[in-house]
A protein has these predicted regions:
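Conserved acetyl-CoA-binding loop-helix of GNAT-fold acetyltransferases
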Residues: 86-89, 95-108, 133, 137
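A short beta-loop-alpha structural element at the N-terminal edge
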Residues: 4-19
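Conserved active-site alpha-helix within GNAT-family acetyltransferase domains
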Residues: 100, 112, 116, 123-145, ...
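Conserved beta-strand in the GNAT
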Residues: 55, 61-70, 83, 88
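A short helix-loop-beta-strand connector motif used in the catalytic cores of GNAT acetyltransferases and
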Residues: 43-55, 83
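Conserved GNAT-fold acetyl-CoA-binding loop/helix
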Residues: 19-42
């Protein structure tokens, strides 16, 4: 077994988070540097009071990440709503309790923030890989149908600018 730590990512953790995202697929290539756009975006993320990025480390190795946004709300007696995005575990570390540990911490933080509800969208392709079972085991219910509209392609600069450093 390994020593698992789930913590809030800080300014110094950009490369760790990018590395986990790169390793979500077997054989994913970990970037050597972040692009200017990635650094600017990360700076905005870590400075935001509404966003929390979680970083899971197994024996000090970054192996998982998830993001929670707490949105103020004038409904539900002004209780905020939490949104979960980008739950990722490195391919070689899946099915070891890492996503569950991150989500349990995230849910505890959402409760502490007084959130009325936590919303999580999961792609249909994850119905067969265990992710939906995990979410259900943590109390999430498939009670709504989500819709998504992509307004633009991801900026090419996020990928190509990495080479420019």
């Amino acid at each position: 077994m390994f020593d698992l730590v789930v913590r809030t990512a800080g300014a110094e953790d950009l490369m760790a988070v990018l590395g986990v995202h790169a390793r979500r697929d077997p054989g994913g290539e970990v970037p050597r540097s972040a692009s200017g756009l990635e650094r600017q975006t990360w700076d905005r993320v870590v400075r935001s009071d509404e966003l929390t990025v979680y970083l899971a480390e197994a024996d000090g190795d970054p192996v998982g990440t998830a993001t929670m946004m707490v949105m103020p709300n004038v409904t539900y007696a002004c209780a905020p709503t939490a949104f979960v995005e980008a739950v990722v575990v490195a391919a070689e570390h899946r099915r070891q309790g890492i996503a569950g540990a991150m989500l349990r911490q995230l849910l505890a933080d959402a409760r502490s923030a007084g959130c009325n509800k936590v919303q999580l969208l999961s792609h249909k392709r994850h119905a067969s890989d265990g992710a939906h079972r995990l979410y259900s085991s943590l109390g999430f219910e498939p009670e709504a149908e989500g819709f998504r509209l992509y307004l633009q392609q991801a900026p090419a600069s996020a990928q190509s600018a990495r080479a420019d450093g």
